Amino acid sequence: MTLLSRVLGLVRDVVIAHLIGAGAAADVFLFANRIPNFLRRLFAEGAFSQAFVPVLAEYQQSGDMNKTREFIGKVSGTLGGLVSIVTILAMVGSPHVAALFGMGWFTDWMNDGPDAHKFEQASLLLKITFPYLWFVTFVAFSGAVLNTIGKFGVMSFSPVLLNIAMIATALFLAPQMDNPDLALAIGIFLGGLLQFLFQIPFMKQAGLLVKPKWAWRDEGVTKIRKLMIPALFGVSVSQINLLLDTVIASFLMTGSISWLYYSDRLLEFPLGLFGIAISTVILPTLARHHVNREGDSAKSAVDFRNTMDWGVRMIFLLGVPAAIGIAVLAQPMLLTLFMRGNFMLNDVYAASYSLRAFNAGLLSFMLIKILANGYYARQDTKTPVKIGIIAMVSNMGFNLLAIPFSYVGLAIASAMSATLNAYLLYRGLAKADVYHFSRKSAVFFVKVLLAAIAMGAAVWYYVPEINQWAKMDFFMRVYWLVWLIVLAAIVYGATLILLGVRKHHLLTKN
């Protein structure tokens, strides 16, 4: 399901690139899309799940189903009330949101500059896209509940509906409107609604669809609140950094936001397919091991450490070849996927520079998802917050140092900040004797790196020059790209086998 969602996400971006390219309209829509997208990552893949799942695991561990159902109702009611207020305020105050995150456009609007129209259009689009916050909050809530009972497929499939809605509005509604970016914003709203409605039958089938109830002072809700407030910052530092990049990009040349977006989206494919998916799967297991520590603390600690180590090994296995593959195939991938309609060859070149810069931090972005779980499963949110503050402040400093590199400098700064974040998260776990990078995993990493280098060399040898790619028709580009990816997989897999990697190296309790 996750693979289907990511593939459709790429199809959606291909359609968007064809429709609005990388010009002013694209910058405005992608700006308006980034806010709910940030909130999706924050809630669906971030702070809420990190705070809610461990507490829910405690209620489920008690074996009292009625108490668990009552807890779910109180959380949904309290969360729903708060998010409703925030959503309404954001819709009414959308010009203020646009001014905050699009300061460059707002400055032009105040001074009748050339980008004044971007600020006005962004304010309008935010009114349409912000209700997505309300929908995605409940999607994240129900998805977290279903994940704890082993129904991972429901949450994995939900983003498919968002992608379908956006593709449909781009193909059928946009041609009927003067502003195609407005149709895309409507697609975000409809996608959120479909995701929300899709979850309801599964919650009912599981016997967990209960009446929401406001319970701000409830013991369980209070515990989640205390865990979530710092986690909101700690788990989403990379996303906050991207928002800060958006603010700075609004001062740069037209196209900067679009080039950064398309770069980020290509990077999101392996990050979402591997990093977030693995993180989502291991969090309930880690939380369970932590809860079970009262029965057999020594065994629980070992199980916790083994689960963490397995997650890190999987990130190495999938993330290292993904990073090297993207570095070699950055321009061919961008050209094959996006160069049509309003997306030109110069956009391919521009986006490839920021893609390679972002890609330098891919492994760190993925490791953050795993390492952060080592804290949140133990209900420790303070440490990631401290680390997050350091990483975010560092990102601001890196941005200043990278000013000469324009929008590419923003991507470089994000990669450097993510690497620092991942290192500090690991160091904290090691100091607390929660998780140490095992010797077997170190040997495994070396083998993975050697295999990935061999893979990258083989692909680099056979890949055609970019001018040759530009002259190919679409189907020939796809043929070459698929062939190179298959070649990469064969070389990578064969080299791993030659280096002695076997199935038992991939098991949790290796």
Curated annotation (Swiss-Prot):
Pfam families named among the record's database cross-references: MurJ
Which stretches are transmembrane? Answer: 13-33, 81-101, 130-150, 154-174, 182-202, 240-260, 266-286, 315-335, 357-377, 396-416, 443-463, 481-501
Full protein name: Probable lipid II flippase MurJ
Domain of life, source organism: Bacteria
One cellular component GO annotation, for this chain's record?
A: plasma membrane
Subcellular location, in the record's words? Answer: Cell inner membrane
Which species expresses this protein natively? Answer: Haemophilus influenzae (strain ATCC 51907 / DSM 11121 / KW20 / Rd)
Record carries keyword Nucleotide-binding: no
How this chain sits in the membrane, per its record, is: Multi-pass membrane protein
